[in-house]
């Protein structure tokens, strides 16, 4: 059971800080090629944020726009983890170990509209550094290597509960939020090897929590997990990295087995499209696979040989760089069946590929656009979307 004293909260008053010219900031931020520490796409796939040695930056996902409320942004120092609130008013981040302003167990909330840090949460140091963070319109979650913390959000932020979890030093987890029902779920590795747990965060109280759904997905450790926005589908990949499995999160039944490849690979990230029709998976083999969930044949209809093969990807994109986050989008005033898949890469590059399903049922994809995110942010002539 959680205790009120487990996390410490601070509301941060506005600091007196020296004024800095935009010119000086632009010169400092373009000195060398940036390598990202983290990138994340919002739950509704409308925006994304990146973290590096210079702090964080916010962007509209598709079409790409740099999103900052003011030209001058407070110097937050190097950032290791970052998540953007879907309404683009708040950024949640954890400082980097080297040169960071705050401890590794401090969760900072930055108010973009006010252009200042206004809230700080400290998890107990005995649980180690924060390894991942998630935010939805009604819940805030932080994972430590062996502990999970859940708070109310965004108003009157209070800890609801903390739970022990399986050792998870990489913070492997995924959140879902259904805007229709406000249901919020979190998926993360279970205590049994190869299993995944799904917790209904709305059902958590300070006194009790319902037992999470447990799905035995693989024989080896979980490497990646993804939830669709309704929290009804969960996709899992193991350290072997050859097969992705999709389960019904309510019944725990297996739905689809998707074949990424035959050679062992490290899965970098995985994401469902907002419509739940597609699942994208990136690996260290330099490929981004996209599977058609609705086009894949359910497992129960396959014979033994077909099950061993698994369904193949409908689109395969070559990317010779690590992928940190995946998003889906659609550009306004384009054909209804034309959609986009976006990859945010570790070298601070943005890759958009377009795909569509033709009248014969086949999928076609082509390169859409490429951008260097730091250049986009520093280009004074680039259109900047105000954050309201």
Swiss-Prot record:
Xref: Gene3D superfamilies: YVTN repeat-like/Quinoprotein amine dehydrogenase
Keywords: Autophagy, Cytoplasm, Lipid-binding, Membrane, Repeat, WD repeat
Pfam families tied to this protein: PROPPIN
GO molecular function terms listed in the Swiss-Prot or TrEMBL record: phosphatidylinositol-3,5-bisphosphate binding; phosphatidylinositol-3-phosphate binding; phosphatidylinositol-4-phosphate binding; phosphatidylinositol-5-phosphate binding; protein-macromolecule adaptor activity
Swiss-Prot/TrEMBL GO biological process terms: autophagosome assembly; autophagy of mitochondrion; glycophagy; macroautophagy; nucleophagy; pexophagy; protein localization to phagophore assembly site
Tissue distribution: Widely expressed in tissues including pharyngeal, muscle and neuronal tissues.
Positions of the UniProt region annotated as Required for atg-2 binding: 265-328
Gene Ontology cellular component terms for the protein in this record: cytoplasm; cytosol; phagophore assembly site membrane
Subcellular location: Cytoplasm; Preautophagosomal structure membrane
Motif (LRRG motif): 258-261
Skewed-composition ranges (Basic and acidic residues): 1-25
WD repeats mapped onto the chain: 217-257, 262-301
Region feature Disordered, mapped onto this chain: 1-33
Membrane topology: Peripheral membrane protein
Family the entry assigns: Belongs to the WD repeat PROPPIN family.
Stated role: Component of the epg-6/atg-2 complex, which is involved in the generation of autophagosomes from omegasomes and in the distribution of atg-9 and atg-13 during the autophagy-mediated degradation of protein aggregates. Binds to phosphatidylinositols on preautophagosomes, which are early autophagic structures, to promote autophagosome formation.
The record's note on its domains: The LRRG motif is required for recruitment to phosphatidylinositols including phosphatidylinositol 3-phosphate (PtdIns(3)P), phosphatidylinositol 5-phosphate (PtdIns(5)P), phosphatidylinositol 4-phosphate (PtdIns(4)P) and phosphatidylinositol 3,5-bisphosphate (PtdIns(3,5)P2).
Quaternary organization: Interacts with atg-2; the interaction is direct.
Protein name listed in UniProt: Ectopic P granules protein 6
Organism of origin: Caenorhabditis elegans
């Amino acid at each position: 059971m959680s205790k009120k004293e487990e996390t410490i909260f601070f509301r941060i008053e506005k600091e007196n800080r020296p004024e800095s010219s935009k010119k000086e900031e632009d010169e400092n931020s373009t000195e060398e090629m940036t390598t990202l520490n983290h990138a994340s796409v919002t739950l509704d796939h409308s925006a994304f944020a990146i973290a590096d040695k210079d702090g964080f930056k916010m962007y509209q996902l598709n079409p790409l726009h740099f999103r900052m409320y003011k030209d001058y942004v407070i110097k937050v120092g190097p950032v290791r983890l970052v998540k953007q609130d879907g309404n683009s008013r708040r950024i949640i981040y954890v400082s980097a170990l080297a040169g960071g302003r705050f401890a590794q167990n401090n969760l900072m909330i930055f108010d973009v509209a006010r252009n200042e840090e206004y809230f700080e949460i400290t998890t107990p140091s005995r649980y180690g550094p924060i390894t991942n963070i998630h935010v939805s319109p009604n819940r805030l979650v932080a994972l430590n290597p062996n502990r999970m913390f859940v708070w109310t959000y965004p108003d009157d932020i209070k800890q609801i509960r903390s739970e022990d979890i399986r050792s998870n030093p990489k913070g492997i987890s995924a959140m879902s939020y259904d805007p229709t029902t406000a249901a919020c779920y979190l998926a993360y590795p279970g205590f049994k090897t190869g299993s995944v747990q799904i917790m209904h965060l709305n059902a958590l109280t300070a006194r009790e929590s319902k037992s999470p759904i447990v799905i035995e997905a693989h024989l080896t450790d979980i490497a990646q997990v993804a939830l669709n926005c309704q929290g009804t589908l969960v996709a899992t990949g193991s350290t072997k990295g050859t097969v992705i499995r999709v389960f019904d999160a309510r019944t725990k039944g297996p739905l689809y087995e998707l074949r990424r490849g035959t050679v062992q690979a490290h899965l970098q990230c995985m994401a469902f499209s907002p419509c739940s029709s597609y699942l994208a998976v990136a690996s260290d083999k330099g490929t981004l696979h996209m599977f058609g969930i609705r086009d894949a044949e359910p497992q129960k209809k396959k014979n033994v040989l077909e099950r061993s093969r698994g369904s193949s990807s409908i689109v395969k994109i070559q990317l010779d760089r690590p992928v940190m986050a995946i998003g889906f989008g659609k550009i306004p005033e384009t054909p209804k069946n034309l959609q986009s898949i976006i990859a945010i890469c570790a070298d601070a590059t943005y890759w958009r590929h377009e795909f569509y399903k033709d009248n014969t049922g086949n999928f076609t994809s082509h390169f859409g656009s490429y951008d260097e995110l730091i250049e986009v942010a520093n280009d004074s002539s680039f259109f900047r979307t105000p954050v309201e």
